[in-house]
C-alpha cells in the first residue's frame, strides 16, 4: 500500500474543493484493503453545516458504504492534521491508522486556527467562552427513566 498515493488524493480533494468553491482546503478518504471506500471534502460553507469537515464527511460516507459505524479495518488519509471535532469522530469510528499531510499549524497559517478549541477543552465548563452548565434536576430525571 502506497501511503503517498492516498495522501496525494486527499490533497487533490482539498484543492478540488477550493477550486469548486465547496468549502475550505481539506480533503479526506477512507481506504480498506488498499481500495478507496469513501471520500470527503470540506463542505461547511455550501451546506451551512459546521460539522461538514472532510474527515467527518469521509467517515459518514464510509460507514454508509460499509454498513457499519466502526472502521476498524480501514485507514483514514487526510490533507491536514484533524481538528478536535474530527479527532473525536475518528476515535469513535476507530480506524486502524490515520495519515495526514499538513500539520494543524499549517492550517492556522491559512486562517483555520483551531488552537482555541484545545484551550477551551482544558478549561472548567463554567469558564469556557461558551459556558456549559450541568442542570442537576435533569440528571435526576435521567436516572429515574433508566
PLM regions and their residue ranges:
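A short, polar/charged loop-to-alpha-helix boundary motif
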Residues: 46-56
Amino acid at each position: 500500500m502506497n501511503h503517498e498515493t492516498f495522501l496525494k488524493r486527499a490533497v487533490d480533494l482539498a484543492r478540488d474543493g477550493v477550486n469548486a468553491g465547496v468549502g475550505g482546503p481539506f480533503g479526506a478518504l477512507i481506504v480498506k484493503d488498499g481500495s478507496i471506500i469513501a471520500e470527503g471534502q470540506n463542505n461547511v460553507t455550501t451546506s451551512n453545516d459546521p460539522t461538514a469537515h472532510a474527515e467527518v464527511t469521509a467517515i459518514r460516507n464510509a460507514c454508509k458504504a460499509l454498513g457499519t459505524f466502526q472502521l476498524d479495518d480501514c485507514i483514514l488519509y487526510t490533507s491536514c492534521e484533524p481538528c478536535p471535532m474530527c479527532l473525536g469522530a475518528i476515535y469513535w469510528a476507530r480506524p486502524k491508522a490515520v495519515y495526514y499531510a499538513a500539520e494543524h499549524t499549517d492550517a492556522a497559517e491559512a486562517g483555520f486556527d483551531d488552537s482555541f478549541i484545545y484551550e477551551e477543552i482544558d478549561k472548567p465548563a463554567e469558564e469556557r467562552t461558551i459556558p456549559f452548565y450541568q442542570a442537576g434536576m435533569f440528571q435526576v430525571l435521567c436516572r429515574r427513566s433508566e
